[in-house]
Regions:
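Conserved SGNH/GDSL esterase-like catalytic core that processes O-acyl groups on lipids
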Residues: 2, 11-100
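Alpha-helical cap/lid subdomain in secreted, periplasmic
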Residues: 69-142
């Protein structure tokens, strides 16, 4: 499974999924390609410019191999992935106009490199009513 995301993918994949797979003795290879706070627009910019700005953790049998300075294309070429997840930044996840054209272009690129992979969407969780995140007012605190 390859996750293309930000710190939320780090939380969900490295802190939750990897230990569950290890505990259940399910063989799984996880690639977590992340850039803190990364939006779909930023992922798209990194893709277009082929920017090696990501941290990439390769996890196999519970062993994490960290890599810095990875590009999205590098991760897509690394191996045949069964599942690939994409994710919007939490501060943009409720803003419909923040998805396109970036998401469609990212999907097209993923499909070009990994035509047999199942695409997944990692939905971030909402902020609490008393959240102090600077982007939270965009949602009228709801």
């Amino acid at each position: 499974m390859l996750c293309i995301g930000n710190s939320f993918s780090w939380d969900a994949v490295e802190q939750e999924l990897a230990p569950l797979c290890d505990a259940g003795k399910q063989p799984i290879i996880i690639g977590n390609l992340y850039y803190g706070g990364c939006s779909l627009e930023q992922h798209h910019t990194f893709l277009i410019k082929d920017t090696a700005a990501y941290s990439f953790r390769y996890i196999e049998h519970g062993v994490r191999t960290p890599n810095e300075g990875y590009s999205l294309r590098q991760a897509l070429r690394l191996m045949q992935w069964d599942y690939i997840s994409l994710q919007q930044a939490s501060h943009d996840s409720g803003i419909q106009s923040s998805y396109e054209p970036y998401l469609s272009d990212l999907i097209d690129t993923v499909r070009a490199y990994q035509p047999h992979a199942t695409l997944c969407w990692m939905q971030t969780w909402s902020y609490s009513q008393d959240a102090k995140h600077p982007e939270y007012p965009r949602y009228q605190k709801s």
